[in-house]
Amino acid sequence: MANQHLRQAVSAPPPFAAVLEWGTGYEALLALSMFTGDERQDSYEVGKAWFARARAAASSRLLTALRTLVGTDGPRWFLLLGMVHEAGGAHDVERLLSHIRGSRPEDVITALVGGRLPALRTGEGQSLVKSALAGEAKAAAALAERSRAGKSAGIRRLIQTGAKEVTRLTLEVVDRFNREVFNPMGSSAEALSADVSGKASSARRMSSHQLVDFSTGGITYEGEAGIDRVLLVPSIVTRPWITISDWDSTKIICYRAGRPVTGEPNRDMVLVYRALGDETRLRLLRELAAGDRRLAELAQVLGLSKSTLHGHLAVLRSAGLIRLSLGAEKKYGLRPGLPDLNRILADYIGRA
């Protein structure tokens, strides 16, 4: 029989503020992560053509500096997203470069090994970072495990390179990538600015929780210990993916920016019809109709790999059909309400 005198206090998630912010500095780092990494090129809306143009534009000096610094560890650049915000101003690439030049080399390498992540903000965490930077092999492995900031090999590479050389290479890579690839291919500054401006009026009437869901198209975030602010940053180059990183007490969520094109079908309409035009995604929706599920549960029920499901879930989320709940564990579920396909199509072709 249950003990009727036993009570358990469950604390509510801590409050947080949500803020919209854009800048080409964010977009450049996200593009650099794509250029650096080895994820499937066709998983991005920009497609293989973007990668082909970027590779053709990049100099051998850029490629050499990049490989020396981070190898093919694309997500390593996410750890500098907070530095764009910290730099202030227009949050553009030049401001980021100026901020890095004015930073101590120790601060730059600390950020790149994950030292600004909340998991390492404690006294124990900072001691671990210090030991790793001093060259202790076990500390580097423990740092990678605790921060989840990539494999320990990537952290060891940075530590062996040294703080001053890491800073020099970081400046060279970001500067060259900006001049050779990012700017010539188009920074999308106007579209990014328009996305934030378009959401600003609605944002004033929303709670922080509502703004996160509204901006990201289906991410539910209730808050967590150590996070007091959520920075919502639009991105075009990484569509349909959402990038999530942390910087001290700030969670940074880079969501897909809207990019309407006059004369062409509404992008949201295209995404909805594309999402529904696949048997696997329809099975996913039916499974989620029964309740929220973790990725591992979906993989087991549908008999698919997690990597395959990630792609399908990204398409469904981009279409606004499902939501992702962030917390102790990530869960996927259906968003309230379903799109009226007849109305969407009728609006486009001009028939009531």
Regions found by a protein language model. Give the residues of each.
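Extended mid-to-C-terminal alpha-helical interaction segments
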Residues: 209-211, 215, 220-324, 328, ...
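Helix N-cap / beta->alpha transition motif
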Residues: 104, 254-256, 334
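Minor-groove-contacting beta-hairpin "wing" of winged helix-turn-helix DNA-binding domains
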Residues: 328-335
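N-terminal, charged low-complexity regulatory/assembly segments
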Residues: 1-223
